């Protein structure tokens, strides 16, 4: 059995920044540091930060007064920001800048009196935060659609004053079909010049297509609640390549590789490389060889830290 590695894979710039914000806050201010929602969707990362003194909560009413709170990479609604400000909580915002870009678009559509359609997955924290940027007090509304069926059933107030945005971690192929359906049903709809799916999601989906084309089975390292990791598994399966989403080596079964010659490995944008190395080590113990990285797209994007943490870390 030969191992092939997707390129790129694993951490993106937004995840790197979010984790570093929590780490630096712990270093500068000491524990406990409260984090609203898992800072990124990866069990290994969350447990490591929890061991260092991070406390993960789902709502601000679980946060005591006079502590530091970090908003996760997925972003939060304006209502959450207002609640934090009203309580005087010290907040560091780890929202991915590419998610913030979508938030700004939604707020602009609201101010302009346009209704907004968000393409995304119900219940995902990024979706909840993005929908919470729309101020419906002026009579407008924001709608959530997941697929073409939702578009066909959608009723809006004014089809002539309508715009769309997308969750950043969706399948590019699925999203393209939904956008086509929106434009067909609502010809006057506006939107971004390209969809809001982030560079890292696009690059990892392109890479897994190449991997699935060259391998007999694909392993996606990522947690079950990671949207972008699930999309990678689905994409490989659509290419008729068996694919498994695993948190780490401990989730693998030896029988998956019976009769397999080429094993492909990729990782979602919130999965650290150490987990990939653990998978490779276990596969080597089962007789696999190599770990050749495919040619891919280089990523050199970085996002800046909050000023206070950036300055304090240099002291």
Swiss-Prot record:
Catalyzed reactions: isopentenyl diphosphate + 2 oxidized [2Fe-2S]-[ferredoxin] + H2O = (2E)-4-hydroxy-3-methylbut-2-enyl diphosphate + 2 reduced [2Fe-2S]-[ferredoxin] + 2 H(+); dimethylallyl diphosphate + 2 oxidized [2Fe-2S]-[ferredoxin] + H2O = (2E)-4-hydroxy-3-methylbut-2-enyl diphosphate + 2 reduced [2Fe-2S]-[ferredoxin] + 2 H(+)
Q: Any idea which positions bind dimethylallyl diphosphate?
A: 41, 74, 124, 226-228, 270
Q: Which InterPro entries match?
A: LytB/IspH (IPR003451)
Q: Enumerate the residues binding isopentenyl diphosphate.
A: 41, 74, 124, 226-228, 270
Q: Do you know which Pfam families this protein is assigned to?
A: LYTB (PF02401)
Task: State where [4Fe-4S] cluster binds.
Answer: 12, 96, 198
The coenzyme or cofactor needed here is: [4Fe-4S] cluster
Q: Locate the residues binding (2E)-4-hydroxy-3-methylbut-2-enyl diphosphate.
A: 41, 74, 124, 168, 226-228, 270
One biological process term from GO is: isopentenyl diphosphate biosynthetic process, methylerythritol 4-phosphate pathway
Q: Which cysteine pairs are joined by S-S bonds?
A: none
As one GO molecular function, the record gives: metal ion binding
Major enzyme class = oxidoreductase
The positions flagged as active site in the entry are 126
Q: Which pathway is this protein assigned to?
A: Isoprenoid biosynthesis; dimethylallyl diphosphate biosynthesis; dimethylallyl diphosphate from (2E)-4-hydroxy-3-methylbutenyl diphosphate: step 1/1; Isoprenoid biosynthesis; isopentenyl diphosphate biosynthesis via DXP pathway; isopentenyl diphosphate from 1-deoxy-D-xylulose 5-phosphate: step 6/6
**Cofactor: bound how, per the entry note?**
Binds 1 [4Fe-4S] cluster per subunit.
Q: What EC number(s) does the entry state? A: 1.17.7.4
Positions in coiled-coil regions? none
Q: Which UniProt keywords apply?
A: 4Fe-4S, Iron, Iron-sulfur, Isoprene biosynthesis, Metal-binding, Oxidoreductase
Concerning its family, UniProt says:
Belongs to the IspH family.
The record ties this protein, via HAMAP family, to: IspH
* Task performed by this protein: Catalyzes the conversion of 1-hydroxy-2-methyl-2-(E)-butenyl 4-diphosphate (HMBPP) into a mixture of isopentenyl diphosphate (IPP) and dimethylallyl diphosphate (DMAPP). Acts in the terminal step of the DOXP/MEP pathway for isoprenoid precursor biosynthesis.
* Protein name (database record): 4-hydroxy-3-methylbut-2-enyl diphosphate reductase
Q: Which organism is it from?
A: Pseudomonas fluorescens (strain SBW25)
Taxon lineage:
Bacteria, Pseudomonadati, Pseudomonadota, Gammaproteobacteria, Pseudomonadales
């Amino acid at each position: 059995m030969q191992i092939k590695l997707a390129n790129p894979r694993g951490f993106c710039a937004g995840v790197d920044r979010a984790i570093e914000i929590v780490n630096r806050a712990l270093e500068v201010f000491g524990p406990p540091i409260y984090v609203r929602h898992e800072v990124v969707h990866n069990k290994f990362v969350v447990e490591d930060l929890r061991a260092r003194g991070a406390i993960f909560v789902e709502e601000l009413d679980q946060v005591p007064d006079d502590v530091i709170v970090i908003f996760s990479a997925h972003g939060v609604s304006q209502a959450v920001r207002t609640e934090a400000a009203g309580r005087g909580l010290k907040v560091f915002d780890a929202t991915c800048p590419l998610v913030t870009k979508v938030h700004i678009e939604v707020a602009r559509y609201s101010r302009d009196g346009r209704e907004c359609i968000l393409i995304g997955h119900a219940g995902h924290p990024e979706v909840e935060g993005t929908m919470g940027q729309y101020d419906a007090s002026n009579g407008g509304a924001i709608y959530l659609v997941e697929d073409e069926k939702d578009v066909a059933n959608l009723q809006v107030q004014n089809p002539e004053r309508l715009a769309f945005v997308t969750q950043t971690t969706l399948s590019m192929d699925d999203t393209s079909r939904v956008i086509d359906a929106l434009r067909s049903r609502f010809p006057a709809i506006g939107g971004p010049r390209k969809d809001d799916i982030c560079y890292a999601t696009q690059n990892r989906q392109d890479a897994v297509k190449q991997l699935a084309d060259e391998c007999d089975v694909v392993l996606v390292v990522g947690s079950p609640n990671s949207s972008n990791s699930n999309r990678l598994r689905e994409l490989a399966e659509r290419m008729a390549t068996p694919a498994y989403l695993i948190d780490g080596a401990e989730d693998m079964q030896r029988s998956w590789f019976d009769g397999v010659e080429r094993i492909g490995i990729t990782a979602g944008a919130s999965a650290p490389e150490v987990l990939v190395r653990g998978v490779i080590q276990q596969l080597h113990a089962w007789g696999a060889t190599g770990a050749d990285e495919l040619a891919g797209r280089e990523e050199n994007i970085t996002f800046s830290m909050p000023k206070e943490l950036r300055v304090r870390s240099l002291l």
